[in-house]
Amino acid sequence: MTIPTSYLNHTDAEAARKARATYRDGLVAPTSGIAPGFTQANMIVLPRDWAFDFLLYAQRNPKPCPVLDVSDPGSPTTLLAPGADLRTDLPLYRIWRDGKLAEETADATSAWAERDDLVAFLIGCSFTFETPMVEAGIEIRHMTDKSNVPMYLTNRPCRPAGRLKGNMVVSMRPIPASRVADAATISGRFPAVHGAPVHVGAPEQIGISDLSKPDFGDAVRIEPGEVPVFWACGVTPQAAVMASGVPFAITHAPGHMFITDIPDTAYHA
């Protein structure tokens, strides 16, 4: 999706810039509910010789991997937040080696320096449409509980591309049964940040055996009358890294996003 020029160099992005500054200074915390009204993004950084494989993977799997921006090789910058540094301005990073998680760190500068050809992909995040849902009176449980959103690896395979393969990851939010249609309608207006849910109820149908044991993030309460609603998730690329044995990658830690200067309205369909 092309961003209108009027949204670039957005002058009212002080909340987003302040949030990034706190992460640059060392704060580690999930970003749900932070800088409301601004688009958040997942990130995966790959060597140049893997970048085309991933671009094709994202094109074939736009629901979990909606690409918002791609950096030039070797550049830690993005037009989504002029002046930001992708090596330092996320609260928590993951370093991957040969498809295995090697390290979590609040500063990816040293890992980034290992190669001069790294390409960063910023991928839409469902945190972006949480603010409109809250404004519509729909509770977001992990925001209420100040925890991370629960995420699960499903049995739904993504379309492979080149050397990349893997299953879809989903995020889950408990929604009152009477508001599921509203949640789907609101999120569906934001196709660039995962859009409408991919599954409602019956978690076992998508390979989730126990909602109290998410693969990423934190478990949340599901109250009587609520239904688990699942959205495609930008942690899906990390599942591909693991399934494909990618030799080197840097990603955001699940729930710890890059906050852009772009208002969420820029991605409202």
Curated annotation (Swiss-Prot):
Pfam families: D-Glu_cyclase. Belongs to the D-glutamate cyclase family. One of its GO terms (molecular function) is lyase activity. It comes from the Bacteria. It comes from Agrobacterium fabrum (strain C58 / ATCC 33970). InterPro entries: D-Glu_cyclase, Putative_hydro-lyase, UPF0317. This is Putative hydro-lyase Atu3911. The keyword tRNA processing does not apply. SUPFAM superfamilies: PSTPO5379-like. It is an enzyme of class 4 (lyase). NCBIfam families: PRK05463.1.
